[in-house]
Amino acid sequence: MDKTAKYIQKKTKCEFIQQGDGTIVIYSTLDNIEDHLLFLRDDEKCRFELLVDIFGVDYPDREKRFELIYNLLSIVHNIRVHIKLQLYEDDMPPSVVRIFNTASWFEREVFDMYGIEFSNHPDLRRILTDYGFKGHPMLKDFPLTGYEEVRYDIEAKKVVYNPIDLPQDFRMFDSLSPWEGETAKANTKE
């Protein structure tokens, strides 16, 4: 794997590359992501022909809030590559559907969960949440309870939306276990 990692670093001219746990990690940019994916797929020494997944991560405290990770697998060499792409909130990464057909659903999931829009995607719409859903549930600032309750109304015979109604206020719980009482008391006396 060391040879493959060095070869990839030499050819892609990535600023940073790391490896561990049988996975090579490359940091790409918006301008180079398509070229890097094409190289990794088509180069005879790489042959990362399978896009396993594209997933997002939300880092609200970072200047570049989002990170996209493209998970590639070379079945021939039994090696994985993760290509990480850091994005500002308003960045639109290019769709890679023309490079990997499987990217279509992965990009739709990232859009649905994080609100990241992919330029030139052939069918960018929600895939996991309802079409009327407000917001993107994997964002760290999305409320835990959501904005609306969705339920099936038997009488109306349709799905209805209601504002969230939580009859009980949020409470903080004491994390000490009552079963630790005697042990905790004995330890504090020492």
UniProtKB/Swiss-Prot annotation:
Provide the reaction this enzyme catalyses: a quinone + NADH + 5 H(+)(in) = a quinol + NAD(+) + 4 H(+)(out)
Could you tell me the keywords of this UniProt record? Cell membrane, Membrane, NAD, Quinone, Translocase, Transport, Ubiquinone
| Bilayer topology | Peripheral membrane protein
State one Pfam family annotation: Complex1_30kDa
The UniProt record lists the EC number as 7.1.1.-
| SUPFAM superfamilies named in the record | Nqo5-like
Q: Chief subcellular site? A: membrane
Keyword field contains DNA damage? no
Q: Where in the cell is it found?
A: Cell membrane
Position of the signal peptide: none
Entry annotated with the keyword NAD: yes
What is any one of the record's Gene Ontology cellular component terms? plasma membrane
Give the family this protein belongs to, as stated in its UniProt record.
Answer: Belongs to the complex I 30 kDa subunit family.
The family database entries (PANTHER family) matched by this protein are listed as: NADH DEHYDROGENASE [UBIQUINONE] IRON-SULFUR PROTEIN 3, MITOCHONDRIAL (PTHR10884:SF14), NADH DEHYDROGENASE UBIQUINONE IRON-SULFUR PROTEIN 3 (PTHR10884)
Q: Which HAMAP family match?
A: NDH1_NuoC
State its role.
NDH-1 shuttles electrons from NADH, via FMN and iron-sulfur (Fe-S) centers, to quinones in the respiratory chain. The immediate electron acceptor for the enzyme in this species is believed to be ubiquinone. Couples the redox reaction to proton translocation (for every two electrons transferred, four hydrogen ions are translocated across the cytoplasmic membrane), and thus conserves the redox energy in a proton gradient.
Which named protein is this?
NADH-quinone oxidoreductase subunit C
Species annotation: Wolbachia sp. subsp. Brugia malayi (strain TRS)
From the broadest rank down, the organism's phylogenetic lineage runs: Bacteria, Pseudomonadati, Pseudomonadota, Alphaproteobacteria, Rickettsiales
**Per UniProt, what is the name of the gene that codes for the protein in this document?**
nuoC
